[in-house]
């Protein structure tokens, strides 16, 4: 039981039935392994030492000088000399001084002087080299025996000490009584000793980089030197002062020890003991457990009594240790031990000490176990003397999970690549225990500050990913975990970014931790280079041009693309700064050539204004005669030697909407190496890969490593960096198949026996595949008499003839071949057998030899594959929104451009897909380690929004500024994350501000500093003001406000929904719980208290009302949490944060409404008191949506949600959402909303079948648009049916949009502004739009389902649309649904309604009146008055206004613009023509309907013309629709319908029917059939099909006249049929005398386009064009040619 006392401890569970498990041991930590039917063992690595390291070099850090001697000479007397100059121990210096008569010389001039001093070293330091084979590891193994002294002890009786060295890596340890355990260890120091030196100074040692050590500017001796006196570079510690005539002072610098200590800051310090160095190595061991056995498996259970010897002790690992003593008989025996929940129904927790046994009576035994969170009983022994101990464990499984994940991730980051052994990669996948131990291993104590941004992303990704994908097998989860974290370690080439190899797609992907994979080979589409700052780049180019650099050579294809994209922008910047220079970018062909110069970053940037930015996007600049050439062919004016090359390096990765952006910056210093940030190298099993954005070089192990194949998208000329090269020691450059100067890695993997470096391969092709196989149709033989190596040759000649026979001297088969776009080429060793080489196409390339370099870093950037990580795509809508939000944050200066990319990643990429189901698993994950789980079969249920929080925690981790220490610190950040999530999905105006605020506050989410607090608070207050604001936070705190400022604790509510029950069932990965099913709670109607479990037990947080199966309360009380009642749950189903209301288990059912002036009672359920009823008369709150009642009563916090009832006992609202007045009193609003109709009506399956035409005749107000339509559309989308929805007017279309919001629909009407992705399968438009589309030549999609709302509309376009739809349905091409309360043929003018309507017949005035008709104006409520024509309407409206009424007038022409005004409350009358029959919703209490209308009728006696006949009675269906404008609100019980006269079905003579036929005859169906009118309407018209068909131009004119000219159908038809074209308006003036149009009894004259003044008398007369002033005005404009 050694591990119990060690804080850093991991538990590894072996896979059941497995005979081995992998563990990683490290210093200061302890590993406990558990496997089925095996003893629990503790392993600890107690030391790693290096024996006798060899010395590499000694440095002197403190010296002294003795025996100083000087000699000097006068001018012309030669050089002075001293004997000491020959002695290696002396340091000497010659110099010249001025001499003359004053100091003993005859001549004036320079004379020589020499000074020597003896150099002895007082203090030195040594650099030593450690050989990995000299390391020795000591491990202690102890079984959990439970004996008295076992805890934290390792005496010989209990423990075995095992020494492990690289020479003997397999060791066996005999554990007395438990069998033997075999350990196969591969020691890893985690250090590359080839590159590291141990610097030893007195009794301290540091690990330093070898090159740094060798470059130290100090005197040194080689390690082999034994005398220790002949120091090299002595002068580095000695200073000679300026010489005087005969003397020169020499001084020694002080001790360099302090300087060395400063320089070594940050280097790893190494402990020493007795000349041996102690390391912090890791040991990766595989334990073979097959020879282990549990002690005492055959013993029987103990039946006697136990007593507790010592209090239960809690360890720091969440486990407990119990010490018991057996007082019964029958030892040795097994101890019965279990942990139960409080009801003693379920066994929870787990035993760490497997099979605890008593060996002898009265000797104490230690048992270690892991109880669940919360309360539990620990039961030891059997009845009668059973011990029952109550235990409470702090914390929560979710908190635990985050802690563990974070620790796992931290630890992965530290363990580095030592954790993975690529030789036996299979091991990782087969022993899942190991992967878990690695990633989720418990605490890693090392100080681990400053976790990089990427790391946070990764932790977030791990969590989020598991949340999204746990449906897959446990295997893939562990794989991905391993993958991500390793990815972070091995591939993070530089700090925050890295690349990963995808084996499947043979490609490398780069980014900062969130990898977006897409199975596209082409980098060009996924990645985009961008300069860090165009203006900096332009300034560097300007400077380079001044220095004589004439151009640039790109290193890679992507760089060339980047130059092409930004050329215009750079030119604009140059011209804004008046630099007379034009940049021109050319293409690249073949090899990417090398330039010899480089661009250097300049301290100043050029000016770059918004205007220029805008211009650069649109216009091109003028050309100057000085040019700067980028790529393109080499020219004499600009040779490669004078071009800059390799001057850019990757600075960061960011995510665009569709591509990964790679930001480039200028390099400080130039070299020949490729940029390593876009590279990776990896080994897996027997394959090795070197890859970057254009290369994929694959080698395989087949006895020896050989290069197998390589793909090149480009051939570049930089050198492959060593840091990304596998196995680079001992490489002969002449044997590297891919030449070093074409970026061939200097690696043993880059060779193939029998082939030498391919300096003259066909690299000029640029894009080629290299592998080992025969070119098609050729043979290769190995023979001595073959030609020598030469440039590669193509197997086809220039004329296309195939050369079939080839040979080589000593190559290996299959031969090396290249496949390019022009055919197949062989390697340089392979020559033609018979053909002369001159006749063949040979390679144009010769690659020179660089320097041979046989030594390299052994750093291996490892990569595990990480496929489909996050499969989301940002939709354009969200992208635009994000840009807006981010832009504001940028302007306010709270964010830099680099952060911007990160915010994009955080909010955009991870959230745009509805996160949906997968998240549940996250919550389950928490339950994996410890049993309590969600109280429902979550996997089968749909989620509630609160549970989404789990993912949010994962996502918020991304934005954290430091990894939070405790889970509670996460909560503010969590709330913000939650808001951002919500905002991006559905935005309202007030939310935008809150979101911006949230993003602004994120960087300091953990500790909001005061300044932040203030700015966030102000912002919050401004953005929250739309409804009610409270300053007493307890009663109603606006969630964003409260969470931002106070950091309330939303997780707390959530945690109460975790219950503690679960069945035990072992799973592969963690123990996956199977939760017992939980039913839906059933409550009786009444008021309830809502309690929350806190640290001190339950406390009341509010109240609520249960009615008709729905529970109602305030949103701020529960914030959407799931409620529990007697172990069953109720889930939220509707909420409105603005009104602060939420309902559970159904829509809002409280229907009482407070009437102004009535008294009410508040039934106050205060915490800790009995309910009491307080009667009061409410005041008024005025808000921008109207007035609401205000109750001035102040109860204690926790009363929110108490019901307010009226005299009839109906609940009129809830208490608790209000404001504090100036005097400090609290005033609550009566919070109430409309009763909701259950919104998922049953929908028959067969309405979606083709050939099926359904008529839904629901009464007005039954919810066709609000309830049935969304349900039908959702089902249609689910079935993938191409659907069309038709609305009669734009207004109804806009109402539909409200009901259908959130569904993917393309709105084809200007009334609705919405974003479209192009993937929607549902279209929505107006009846007339659809008919016009059918008439025009555009192809109308083949809709599978067409839904027509208000299908009683008798406009010609609507009738025609019905005809077309019914024809499509009859042909079996589609299904149709006609929604109307009054389908054609219905005869009931008084249909059913939601609320009772008082119908009353009385005399209704038909024109203005002076007296009488008081009932019209005395009515208190709002009235809708139907009038037969616009003229009558104007008359009546004027009369009503005279009587002081506020009137809104509606007609077909004004409907779209005026209808909006009826939404406000400031009107008394709406005066409307029959257009309002089409689904217009007025919140009115009365309809006045004279049941009269004007009808257009075609007169055929004499000259054919259209008159407006009437007023005449309306049809039954019109009457029913008019009456249906009221009676819609179930709460209004006294709506009135005032009518006059009876309706009449006599509309056959109406012009609309014939006009509809004119339209139908001109509609094309794909099958060429002319559609006929819908059957029930057919007898209204007697025309023959096709009678009105127009040909070619005439039809186009017909459509134009209706669409652009706004003419009635009949008139348009007459004009078009005559063959007149659209622009010709002469027909408006050449009619007969009778057709003269009058306005107020005056003949109308107008000015034509030609400037003549003519009388308006059209050739065909249609009364509709002059029946009212507006229509006439429009026709005059038409006739004048202005349309």
Curated annotation (Swiss-Prot):
<keyword id="KW-0899">Viral immunoevasion</keyword>
<dbReference type="InterPro" id="IPR036253">
    <property type="entry name" value="Glycoprot_cen/dimer_sf"/>
</dbReference>
<keyword id="KW-1015">Disulfide bond</keyword>
<dbReference type="Pfam" id="PF21659">
    <property type="entry name" value="Flavi_E_stem"/>
</dbReference>
<feature type="active site" description="Charge relay system; for serine protease NS3 activity">
    <location>
        <position position="1200"/>
    </location>
</feature>
<dbReference type="InterPro" id="IPR000752">
    <property type="entry name" value="Flavi_NS2A"/>
</dbReference>
<keyword id="KW-1161">Viral attachment to host cell</keyword>
<feature type="transmembrane region" description="Helical">
    <location>
        <begin position="1012"/>
        <end position="1030"/>
    </location>
</feature>
<feature type="glycosylation site" description="N-linked (GlcNAc...) asparagine; by host">
    <location>
        <position position="153"/>
    </location>
</feature>
<dbReference type="InterPro" id="IPR038055">
    <property type="entry name" value="Glycoprot_E_dimer_dom"/>
</dbReference>
<keyword id="KW-1043">Host membrane</keyword>
<keyword id="KW-1164">Virus endocytosis by host</keyword>
<dbReference type="GO" id="GO:0006508">
    <property type="term" value="P:proteolysis"/>
</dbReference>
<feature type="site" description="Cleavage; by autolysis">
    <location>
        <begin position="1065"/>
        <end position="1066"/>
    </location>
</feature>
<feature type="domain" description="Helicase C-terminal">
    <location>
        <begin position="1411"/>
        <end position="1582"/>
    </location>
</feature>
<feature type="site" description="Involved in NS3 ATPase and RTPase activities">
    <location>
        <position position="1522"/>
    </location>
</feature>
<dbReference type="InterPro" id="IPR038345">
    <property type="entry name" value="Flavi_E_Stem/Anchor_dom_sf"/>
</dbReference>
<feature type="site" description="Cleavage; by host signal peptidase">
    <location>
        <begin position="495"/>
        <end position="496"/>
    </location>
</feature>
<dbReference type="GO" id="GO:0005576">
    <property type="term" value="C:extracellular region"/>
</dbReference>
<feature type="transmembrane region" description="Helical">
    <location>
        <begin position="446"/>
        <end position="466"/>
    </location>
</feature>
<feature type="disulfide bond">
    <location>
        <begin position="807"/>
        <end position="811"/>
    </location>
</feature>
<dbReference type="Pfam" id="PF07652">
    <property type="entry name" value="Flavi_DEAD"/>
</dbReference>
<feature type="site" description="Involved in NS3 ATPase and RTPase activities">
    <location>
        <position position="1525"/>
    </location>
</feature>
<keyword id="KW-1170">Fusion of virus membrane with host endosomal membrane</keyword>
<feature type="topological domain" description="Cytoplasmic">
    <location>
        <begin position="1059"/>
        <end position="1683"/>
    </location>
</feature>
<dbReference type="InterPro" id="IPR001157">
    <property type="entry name" value="Flavi_NS1"/>
</dbReference>
<dbReference type="InterPro" id="IPR011998">
    <property type="entry name" value="Flavi_Glycoprot_E_cen/dimer"/>
</dbReference>
<feature type="transmembrane region" description="Helical">
    <location>
        <begin position="916"/>
        <end position="940"/>
    </location>
</feature>
<keyword id="KW-0862">Zinc</keyword>
<feature type="disulfide bond">
    <location>
        <begin position="302"/>
        <end position="333"/>
    </location>
</feature>
<feature type="disulfide bond">
    <location>
        <begin position="499"/>
        <end position="510"/>
    </location>
</feature>
<keyword id="KW-0543">Viral nucleoprotein</keyword>
<dbReference type="InterPro" id="IPR001650">
    <property type="entry name" value="Helicase_C-like"/>
</dbReference>
<feature type="domain" description="Helicase ATP-binding">
    <location>
        <begin position="1245"/>
        <end position="1401"/>
    </location>
</feature>
<feature type="topological domain" description="Cytoplasmic">
    <location>
        <begin position="941"/>
        <end position="946"/>
    </location>
</feature>
<feature type="short sequence motif" description="DEAH box">
    <location>
        <begin position="1349"/>
        <end position="1352"/>
    </location>
</feature>
<dbReference type="Pfam" id="PF00948">
    <property type="entry name" value="Flavi_NS1"/>
</dbReference>
<feature type="binding site">
    <location>
        <begin position="1258"/>
        <end position="1265"/>
    </location>
    <ligand>
        <name>ATP</name>
    </ligand>
</feature>
<keyword id="KW-0261">Viral envelope protein</keyword>
<feature type="transmembrane region" description="Helical">
    <location>
        <begin position="947"/>
        <end position="965"/>
    </location>
</feature>
<dbReference type="GO" id="GO:0003724">
    <property type="term" value="F:RNA helicase activity"/>
</dbReference>
<feature type="topological domain" description="Extracellular">
    <location>
        <begin position="1"/>
        <end position="445"/>
    </location>
</feature>
């Amino acid at each position: 039981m050694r591990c119990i006392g060690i804080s850093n401890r991991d538990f590894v569970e072996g896979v059941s039935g497995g005979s081995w498990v992998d563990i990683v041991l490290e210093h200061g930590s302890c590993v406990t392994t558990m496997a089925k039917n095996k003893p629990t063992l503790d392993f600890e690595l107690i030391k790693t030492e290096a024996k006798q390291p060899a010395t590499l070099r000694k440095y002197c850090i403190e010296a002294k000088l003795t025996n100083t001697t000087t000699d000097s000479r006068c001018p012309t007397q030669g050089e002075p000399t001293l004997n000491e100059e020959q002695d290696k121990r002396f340091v000497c210096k010659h110099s010249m001084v001025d001499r003359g008569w004053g100091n003993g010389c005859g001549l004036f001039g320079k004379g020589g002087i020499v000074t020597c001093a003896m150099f002895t070293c007082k203090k030195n330091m040594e650099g030593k080299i450690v050989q990995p084979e000299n390391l020795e590891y000591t491990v202690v193994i102890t079984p959990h025996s439970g004996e008295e002294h076992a805890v934290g002890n390792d005496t010989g009786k209990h423990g075995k000490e095992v020494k492990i060295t690289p020479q003997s890596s397999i060791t066996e340890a005999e554990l007395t009584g438990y069998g033997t355990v075999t350990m196969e260890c591969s020691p890893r120091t985690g250090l590359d000793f080839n590159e590291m030196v141990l610097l030893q100074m007195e009794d301290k040692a540091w690990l330093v980089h070898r090159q740094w050590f060798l470059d130290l500017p100090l005197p040194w001796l080689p390690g082999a030197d034994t005398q220790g006196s002949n120091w090299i570079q002595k002068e580095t510690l000695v200073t000679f002062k300026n010489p005087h005539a005969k003397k020169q002072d020499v001084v020694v610098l002080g001790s360099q020890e302090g300087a060395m200590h400063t320089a070594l800051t940050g280097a790893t310090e190494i402990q020493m003991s007795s000349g041996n160095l102690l390391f912090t190595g890791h040991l990766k061991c595989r334990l073979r457990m097959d020879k282990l056995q549990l002690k005492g498996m055959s013993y029987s259970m103990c039946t006697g009594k136990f007593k507790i010897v010592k209090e239960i002790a809690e360890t720091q690992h969440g486990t407990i240790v119990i010490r018991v003593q057996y007082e019964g008989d029958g030892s040795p025996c097994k101890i019965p031990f279990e942990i139960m929940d409080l009801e003693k129904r379920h066994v929870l927790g787990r035993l760490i000490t497997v099979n605890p046994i008593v060996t002898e009576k009265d000797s104490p035994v230690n048992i270690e176990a892991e109880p669940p969170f919360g309360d539990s009983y620990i039961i030891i022994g059997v009845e009668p003397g059973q011990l029952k101990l109550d235990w409470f464990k702090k914390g929560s499984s979710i908190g635990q999970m985050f802690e563990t994940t974070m620790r796992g991730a931290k630890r992965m980051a530290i363990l580095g690549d030592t954790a993975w052994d690529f030789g036996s990669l299979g091991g990782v996948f087969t022993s899942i225990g190991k992967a878990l131990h690695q990633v989720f291993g418990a605490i890693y104590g090392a100080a681990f500050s400053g976790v990089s941004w990427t790391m946070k992303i990764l932790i977030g990704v791990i969590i989020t990913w598991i949340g999204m994908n746990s449906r897959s097998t446990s295997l893939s989860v562990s794989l991905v975990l391993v993958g991500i974290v390793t990815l972070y370690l091995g591939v993070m080439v530089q700090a925050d970014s890295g690349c990963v190899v995808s084996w499947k797609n043979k490609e490398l992907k780069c980014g900062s931790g969130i990898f977006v994979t897409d199975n596209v080979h082409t980098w060009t589409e996924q990645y985009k280079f961008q300069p860090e700052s165009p203006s900096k780049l332009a300034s560097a180019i300007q400077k380079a041009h001044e220095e004589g650099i004439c151009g640039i050579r790109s290193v890679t294809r992507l760089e060339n693309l980047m130059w092409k994209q930004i050329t215009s922008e750079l030119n604009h910047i140059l011209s804004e700064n008046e630099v007379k220079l034009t940049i021109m970018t050319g293409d690249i062909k073949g090899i990417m050539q090398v330039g010899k110069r480089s661009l250097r970053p300049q301290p100043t940037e050029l000016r770059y204004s918004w205007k220029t930015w805008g211009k650069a996007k649109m216009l091109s600049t003028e050309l100057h005669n000085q040019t700067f050439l980028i790529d393109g062919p080499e020219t004499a004016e600009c040779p490669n030697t004078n071009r800059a090359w390799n001057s850019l390096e990757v600075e960061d990765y960011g995510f665009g909407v569709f591509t990964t952006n790679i930001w480039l910056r200028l390099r400080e210093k130039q070299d020949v190496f490729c940029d390593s940030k876009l590279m990776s190298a990896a080994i897996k099993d027997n394959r090795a890969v070197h890859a970057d954005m254009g290369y994929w070089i694959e080698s395989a192990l087949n006895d020896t490593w050989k290069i197998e194949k390589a793909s090149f998208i480009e051939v570049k000329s930089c050198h492959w960096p060593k840091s990304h090269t596998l196995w680079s020691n001992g490489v002969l450059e002449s044997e590297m198949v891919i030449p070093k100067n074409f970026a061939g890695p200097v690696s043993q993997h880059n060779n193939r026996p029998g082939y030498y470096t391919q300096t003259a391969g066909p690299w000029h092709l640029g894009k080629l595949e290299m592998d080992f196989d025969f070119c098609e149709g050729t043979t290769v033989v190995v023979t001595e008499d073959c030609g020598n190596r030469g440039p590669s040759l193509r197997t086809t000649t220039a004329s296309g003839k195939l050369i079939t026979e080839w040979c080589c001297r000593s190559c290996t088969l299959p031969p090396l071949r290249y496949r390019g776009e022009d055919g197949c080429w062989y390697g340089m060793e392979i020559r033609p057998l018979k053909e002369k080489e001159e006749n063949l196409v040979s390679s144009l390339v010769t690659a020179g030899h660089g320097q041979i370099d046989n030594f390299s870093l052994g750093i291996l950037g490892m990569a595990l594959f990480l496929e489909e990580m996050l499969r989301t795509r940002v939709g354009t809508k969200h992208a635009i929104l994000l840009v807006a939000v981010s832009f504001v944050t940028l302007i306010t200066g709270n964010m830099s451009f680099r952060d911007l990319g990160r915010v994009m990643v955080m909010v955009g990429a991870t959230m745009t897909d509805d996160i949906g189901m997968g998240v549940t698993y996250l919550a389950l994950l928490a339950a994996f380690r410890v049993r309590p789980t969600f109280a429902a079969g979550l996997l089968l249920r749909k989620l509630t929004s609160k549970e989404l929080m789990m993912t949010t925690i994962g996502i918020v981790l991304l934005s954290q500024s430091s990894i939070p220490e405790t889970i509670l610190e996460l909560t503010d950040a969590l709330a913000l994350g939650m808001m951002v999530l919500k905002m991006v999905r559905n935005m309202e105006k007030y939310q935008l501000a809150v979101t911006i605020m949230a993003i602004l506050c994120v960087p300091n989410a953990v500790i909001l500093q005061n300044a932040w607090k203030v700015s966030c608070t102000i912002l919050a207050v401004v953005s929250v003001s739309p409804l009610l604001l409270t300053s007493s936070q307890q009663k109603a705190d606006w969630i964003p406000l409260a969470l931002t400022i106070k950091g309330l604790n939303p997780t707390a509510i959530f945690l109460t929904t975790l219950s503690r029950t679960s069945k035990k069932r072992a799973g592969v990965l963690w123990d996956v719980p199977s939760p017992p099913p939980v039913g839906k709670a059933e409550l009786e109607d009444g008021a309830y208290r809502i309690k929350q479990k806190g640290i001190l037990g339950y406390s009341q947080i509010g109240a609520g009302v249960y009615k008709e199966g729905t529970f109602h309360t305030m949103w701020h009380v529960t914030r959407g949490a799931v409620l529990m009642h007697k172990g069953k749950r109720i889930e939220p189903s509707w909420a409105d944060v603005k009104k602060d209301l939420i309902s559970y288990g159904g829509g809002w059912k409280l229907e009482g409404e407070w009437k102004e002036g009535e008294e009410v009672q508040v039934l106050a359920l205060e915490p800790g008191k009995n309910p009491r009823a307080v009667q009061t008369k409410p005041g008024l709150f005025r808000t921008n949506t109207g007035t609401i009642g205000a109750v001035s009563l102040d109860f204690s916090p926790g009363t929110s949600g108490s019901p307010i009832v009226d005299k009839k006992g109906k609940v009129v609202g809830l208490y608790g959402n209000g404001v504090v007045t100036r005097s400090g009193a609290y005033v609550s609003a009566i919070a109430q909303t409309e009763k909701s109709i259950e919104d998922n009506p049953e929908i028959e399956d067969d309405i979606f079948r083709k050939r099926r035409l359904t008529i839904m005749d629901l009464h007005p107000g039954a919810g066709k648009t609000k309830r049935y339509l969304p349900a039908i559309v959702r089902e249609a989308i689910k079935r993938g049916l191409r659907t069309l929805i038709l609305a009669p007017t734009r207004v109804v279309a806009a109402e539909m949009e409200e009901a259908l919001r959130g569904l993917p629909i393309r709105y084809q009407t200007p009334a609705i502004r919405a974003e479209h992705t192009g993937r929607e399968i549902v279209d929505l438009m107006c009846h007339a739009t659809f008919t016009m589309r059918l008439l025009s030549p555009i192809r109308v999609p083949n809709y599978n389902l067409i839904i027509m709302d208000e299908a009683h509309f008798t406009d010609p376009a609507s009738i025609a649309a019905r005809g077309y739809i019914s024809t499509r349905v009859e042909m079996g091409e589609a299904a149709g649904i006609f929604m109307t309360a009054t389908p054609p043929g219905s005869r009931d003018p008084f249909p059913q309604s939601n609320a009772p309507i008082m119908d009353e017949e009385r005399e209704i005035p038909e024109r203005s009146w002076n007296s009488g008709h008081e009932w019209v104006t005395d009515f208190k409520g709002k009235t809708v008055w139907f009038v037969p024509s616009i003229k009558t309407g104007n008359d009546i409206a004027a009369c009503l206004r005279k009587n002081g009424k506020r009137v809104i007038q509606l007609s077909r022409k004004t409907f779209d613009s005026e209808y909006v005004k009826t939404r406000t409350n400031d009107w008394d009358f709406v005066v409307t023509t029959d257009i309002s029959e089409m689904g217009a919703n007025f919140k009115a209490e009365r309809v006045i309907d004279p049941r009269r209308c004007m009808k257009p009728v075609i007169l055929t006696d004499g000259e054919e013309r259209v008159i407006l006949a009437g007023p005449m009675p309306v049809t039954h269906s019109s009457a029913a629709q008019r009456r249906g404008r009221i009676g819609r609100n179930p709460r209004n019980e006294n709506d009135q319908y005032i009518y006059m006269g009876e309706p009449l079905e006599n509309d056959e003579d109406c012009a609309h029917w014939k006009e509809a036929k004119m339209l139908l005859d001109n509609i094309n169906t794909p099958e060429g059939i002319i559609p006929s009118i819908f059957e029930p309407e057919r007898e209204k018209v007697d025309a023959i099909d096709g009678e009105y068909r127009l040909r070619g131009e005439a039809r186009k004119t017909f459509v134009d006249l209706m669409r652009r000219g706004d003419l009635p159908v009949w008139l348009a038809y007459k004009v078009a049929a005559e063959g007149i074209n659209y622009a010709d308006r002469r027909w408006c003036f050449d009619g007969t005398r009778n057709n003269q149009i009058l306005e107020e009894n005056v003949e109308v004259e107008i000015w034509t386009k030609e400037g003549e003044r003519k009388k308006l008398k059209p050739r065909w007369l249609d009364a509709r064009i002059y029946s009212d002033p507006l229509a006439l005005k429009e026709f005059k404009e038409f006739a004048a040619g202005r349309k």
